A protein has these predicted regions:
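N-terminal pre-domains immediately preceding structured catalytic cores
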Residues: 2-134, 141-184
Length: 184
């Protein structure tokens, strides 16, 4: 069922009269995409316990294990509730990291997205030329995953801040079009 929900959210299939758009700009507007992302975040919690054990990560920490590229395509799952990012290769959890998402007045959008563009160093045009190392944009409004201050609580203007070393590694294994699931 989980795989069906994820596939529907990515392919733009219509179910029970609700359209699920594959367009990243509208993905956050669909209930199905938000539910698929929330389900992916819930499953990631379970997978993390199985892969890395129960010890919680402190802000700025991450775990990464070697998983062969033959295991499948990459996807990123963001849990806003847990302030965590997860990288999968196929159905195998590769990495887990703490994040800092958007604060209450500038929330990170939830839903199913894909990486639209990447740049190793970007400077915010909106927020005082702030550096955004290893930026991976998934929202046309300029929301991205990037390296930045990571207090372990929502503190950004909507972006997903990652620890520097994790952001760099993640940048090297994702491509334009890599799915990004952002949920509770």
């Amino acid at each position: 069922m989980k795989q069906l929900a994820l596939a529907l959210a990515l392919t733009g299939t219509c179910v029970l009269g609700f359209s699920v758009s594959a367009n990243p700009a509208s993905a956050l507007e669909t209930y199905e995409a938000q539910m698929a992302a929330s389900d992916a975040a819930s499953q990631a919690r379970v997978d993390m316990l199985e892969a890395f054990g129960p010890k919680p990560l402190k802000p700025g920490q991450y775990l990464w294990r070697d998983v062969p590229a033959s295991a499948g395509s990459e996807r990123v799952v963001i849990s806003l509730a847990d302030q965590m990012a997860y990288l999968y290769r196929g159905e195998t959890l590769v990495a887990a990291s703490t994040i800092s998402s958007g604060r209450d007045d500038k929330p990170t959008p939830d839903g199913v997205f894909s990486i639209l563009s990447k740049t190793p160093m970007w400077r915010s045009k909106k927020y005082d030329n702030a550096p955004m190392p290893f930026a991976q944009f998934f929202d046309p409004a300029g929301i991205a995953m990037h390296a930045g201050y990571n207090p372990g609580v929502p503190a950004s203007h909507g972006c997903i801040r990652l620890p520097m070393a994790f952001a760099k590694k993640l940048y090297t294994v994702t491509d334009i079009g890599t799915p990004v699931y952002i949920g509770g």
